Amino acid sequence: MVKKFEYRGKPAEELESMPLDSLFRLFNSRQRRSLTRGITDGKRKLIREIKDARAGKEGNPIKTHLRDLIVLPSMTGVTVNVFSGKEFRPVEITTEMIGHYLGEYVITNKRVSHGAPGVGASRSSLYVPLK
């Protein structure tokens, strides 16, 4: 049997129909504080684009630099390209992401893989004969 997703005991369908002020009470204090301080114009525009994409009006991929946007239930089922600092990475928004920031799903740094040290990198490598 497949487990149904619930956020704080509420199913996803109920979360979508819930008014925002009662939804905010379910979030942690950090997310609640961020949302009650107000949604900026850029965030409001992105939320509108996501709603249009869910309705089938938006044709272009949605790109954003807003990594501090909290995922709301009205955003689920849409792919958003989030900027990692170098490129836009696609993020498929699912119900498990509700209450988290978009930036949590796009890593901004990558693992460093060092190459072989060059000549003069250490004192002993000065005397290594060149090829």
Curated annotation (Swiss-Prot):
Keywords: Ribonucleoprotein, Ribosomal protein, RNA-binding, rRNA-binding. GO terms for cellular component: cytosolic small ribosomal subunit. One of its GO terms (molecular function) is rRNA binding. Transmembrane segments: none annotated. GO terms for biological process: ribosomal small subunit assembly; translation. SUPFAM superfamilies: Ribosomal protein S19. It comes from the Archaea. InterPro entries: Ribosomal_uS19 (IPR002222), Ribosomal_uS19_CS (IPR020934), Ribosomal_uS19_euk/arc (IPR005713), Ribosomal_uS19_SF (IPR023575). Belongs to the universal ribosomal protein uS19 family. Protein S19 forms a complex with S13 that binds strongly to the 16S ribosomal RNA. This is Small ribosomal subunit protein uS19.
